[in-house]
Amino acid sequence: MKLINHRLLLLSLVILGSCNSKKEVQTVSLKDSYKKDFYIGTALSKDQIEEKNATEDSLIKKEFNAITAENIMKSMFIHPEKDKYDFTLSDKFVAYGEKNKMFIHGHTLIWHSQLAPWMEKIKDSTAMKAFMKDHITTIVSKYKGRVDSWDVVNEALNEDGTLRQSIFLNTLGEKYLIDAFKLAAAADPKVDLYYNDYNNEEPAKREGNINLIKKIKAGGGKIDGVGIQAHWKLNYPSLAEIEKSILEYSALGIKVAFTELDISVLPNPKDLNGADVNQNFEGNAKMNPYPKTLPDSVQVKLADRYASIFKLFLKHKDKISRVTFWGVHDGQSWLNDWPVKGRTNYPLLFDKDLKPKKAYYEVMKQNDTK
């Protein structure tokens, strides 16, 4: 009888130890796993900023230590009329980050897309200069010492590395880029200032981006980092090109951030890459192969892709400041409606039910020695 009790006691201790071990593993988060390496961030929607879903909110606070506003700081929302700013949501966003001791990234000051209608009517250089000075100075000054970094200019390059035609280039010429960084630095000398773009890990666009950064510096602009958006696919871009980009941008003496990371598992019409919001195509069943669930075989491919990417990030952790996912979970991803509306994509680490996917565990595994 005594022997049986000892066995029962031993079995109980083993079971208890196993349960505690599982609980401990589950409490480890992305931000904790990578806290010695770089920030792990996410883009927040309006509803998430307003904490409308308690389960989502708990997940955000547990897993991430950096935040970017997905939309509400873009000009059409924050500066809807010439003499009117609306800081209601941006105030909530910054307060959310401060309350949760998160790195706060402002997105974005100058971008050719999602402009307020009144901005699109600006036709001459004098009016454009006045707009840029007022817009950048007002917003950056308001959050001086509270926002940690800004995307000063977003997506100003074509795929071949030349400057994109935009209302800013057409009215002010390429000097608008230097002026934007000067204005932001004057408004908050200590905040980190970034240029942000997609596909700028591809050779031609990367070369154009490097030349642009050099011009901004030569013109007296303060630029602290480059944002590589990282809207990628299962097989694009190559790890070699990503690594070249990290090395070549870092060699300029600036920080490298991956700012909008997601990995599409769906076919793209015409096999286009990147994140040009003007790309829109009609959908069909072939373009939406996984409307209900992602097959295990594709889950494995997604997990392997994320694993290889984060292994590379860790190799160059001394050069990388932040890795931000473009959304918290699959259900909110912009890729469900781009470049084809109404599809079901699975590009992030958490599914639409907020459950961690195989890709999540593979990302965690890359750093499980710490």
List the predicted regions and their residue ranges.
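Aromatic-rich peripheral "rim/lid" segments of glycoside hydrolase catalytic domains that contact
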Residues: K121, K142, D151-E174, L183, ...
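Noncatalytic carbohydrate-binding groove/subsite architecture in carbohydrate-active enzymes
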Residues: D32-S33, D37, S45-D57, I167-A285
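Sec-dependent signal peptide recognition
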Residues: K2-L11
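Substrate-binding cleft and catalytic face of glycoside hydrolase catalytic domains
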Residues: A66-P80, L89-Y194, Y198-N200, P267-N268
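Bacterial signal peptide processing site
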Residues: N20-K22
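Hydrophobic faces of well-ordered beta-strands that scaffold small-molecule active sites
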Residues: I40-L44, N65-A69, I104-T108, D148, ...
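C-terminal motif of bacterial Sec signal peptides marking the signal peptidase cleavage site
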Residues: L16-S18
